[in-house]
């Protein structure tokens, strides 16, 4: 069964009080922009084969920065000046992929759960779309222009609609094209267009956590829920890494991505950054994803002399795609020389940028080997690294 998704992120977020050039979908939620949380669940679901992300034309740069970890899995399409036009452009971009079904989802709903997607997948049919809903619990009042109550509306059989909403692809595409052609603009969601077009919609229970960030207060609520979610499922994983490289003739070496003037350099297939190699292994260990040699074998000439930041960013991609949040990292460098102290601040700053964590979560220490062994003889540098990463999900029993 071929399933695609259109994620709508072209809005300007005026109701959420967006900062200049910072719509709500690009605001930070925890350590990542809202849109990263939104796309992750779709990217991790194996049944979803194609994902279209519809953005505002002015947001391409900020979007590409925000979704860098998922760029290989997303197709970016520029939207129109209304939600309806943006949705149509996303659907039209899917036409060449010919999916059987398509999810349409609000980019400002960051807490889609995989179990909801799975329930949708087992419910949707060529004849019926699927709509997650929640029963209305509050008492509803109709008021007039002077803010006086006109009547109380019975809430029996009233439900609020959520996304993702899933449809037979060809039928919802035809519905949107007809709506634009006939200038029908009064729809507030895609299920309304489906109803108008004659597509039957089956409802399933939504999730109270699947909130849409519309107002500024919603972002505060999302922060609280994210914190609670991570506390409820404290899957804290610790990974360790070790690496060592010998010296050879040279005039500088690289540690934590920082060039250090020295009368020798480190010998290695890449730039021989022993610190980043150890840290890469530590991060990979938190996912049981092998080691640096598994992903970047030294026998492969394409990795010769490349920056070790490439290796670290690859490990970070693996961590982030699993929803991991780095709690802290600790690196110990063991060498008789050069002196590390003068470069420690620059090293921490470089790791801050790569790991997107605060400096108090980065420890870089250096020690000698008291003149013992090959390190004591000044023949090379060794590094130990430890990474603690918090992942969502319960610890297996």
Swiss-Prot record:
EC annotation from Swiss-Prot or TrEMBL: 2.7.7.60, 4.6.1.12
An individual GO BP term: isopentenyl diphosphate biosynthetic process, methylerythritol 4-phosphate pathway
Chain positions covered by the region annotation 2-C-methyl-D-erythritol 2,4-cyclodiphosphate synthase: 237-397
Residues involved in a divalent metal cation binding: 243, 245, 277
Cofactor(s) it depends on: a divalent metal cation
Highest taxon in the source lineage: Bacteria
Keyword Calcium: no
Protein name: Bifunctional enzyme IspD/IspF
Name of the gene this protein is made from: ispDF
């Amino acid at each position: 069964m071929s399933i695609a998704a259109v994620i709508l992120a072209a809005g300007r977020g005026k109701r959420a009080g967006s900062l200049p050039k910072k719509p709500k979908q690009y605001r930070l939620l925890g350590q990542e922009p809202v849109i990263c949380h939104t796309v992750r669940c779709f990217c991790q679901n194996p049944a979803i084969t194609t994902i279209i992300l519809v953005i505002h034309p002015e947001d391409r740069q900020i979007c590409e920065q925000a979704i860098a970890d998922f760029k290989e899995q997303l197709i970016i399409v520029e939207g129109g000046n209304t939600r309806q036009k943006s949705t149509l452009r996303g659907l039209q971009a899917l036409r060449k992929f010919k999916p059987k079904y398509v999810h349409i989802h609000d980019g400002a709903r960051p807490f889609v759960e995989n179990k909801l997607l799975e329930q949708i997948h087992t419910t949707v049919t060529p004849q019926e779309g699927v709509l997650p809903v929640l029963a209305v619990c509050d008492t509803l009042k109709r008021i007039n222009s002077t803010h006086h109550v006109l009547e109380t509306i019975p809430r029996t059989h009233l439900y609020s609609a959520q996304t993702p909403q899933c449809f037979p692809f060809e039928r919802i595409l035809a519905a949107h094209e007809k709506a634009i052609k006939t200038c029908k603009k009064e729809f507030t969601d895609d299920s309304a267009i489906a109803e108008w077009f004659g597509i039957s919609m089956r409802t399933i229970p939504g999730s109270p956590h699947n909130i849409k960030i519309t107002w500024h207060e919603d972002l505060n609520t999302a922060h609280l829920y994210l914190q609670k979610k991570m506390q409820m499922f404290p899957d804290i994983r610790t990974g360790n890494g070790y690496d060592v490289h010998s010296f050879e003739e040279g005039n500088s070496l690289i540690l934590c991505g920082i060039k250090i003037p020295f009368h020798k350099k480190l010998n290695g297939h890449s730039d021989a950054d022993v610190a980043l190699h150890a840290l890469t292994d530590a991060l990979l260990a938190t996912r049981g994803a092998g080691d640096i040699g598994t992903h970047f074998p030294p026998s492969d000439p394409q990795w010769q002399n490349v920056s070790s930041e490439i290796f670290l960013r690859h490990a970070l991609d693996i961590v982030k795609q699993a929803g991991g949040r780095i709690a802290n990292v600790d690196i110990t460098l063991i060498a008789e020389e050069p002196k590390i102290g003068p470069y420690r601040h620059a090293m921490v700053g470089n790791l801050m940028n790569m790991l997107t964590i605060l400096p108090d979560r980065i420890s870089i220490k250096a020690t000698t080997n008291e003149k013992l062994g090959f390190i004591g003889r000044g023949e090379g540098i060794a590094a130990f690294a430890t990474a603690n990463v918090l992942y969502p999900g319960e610890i297996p029993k």
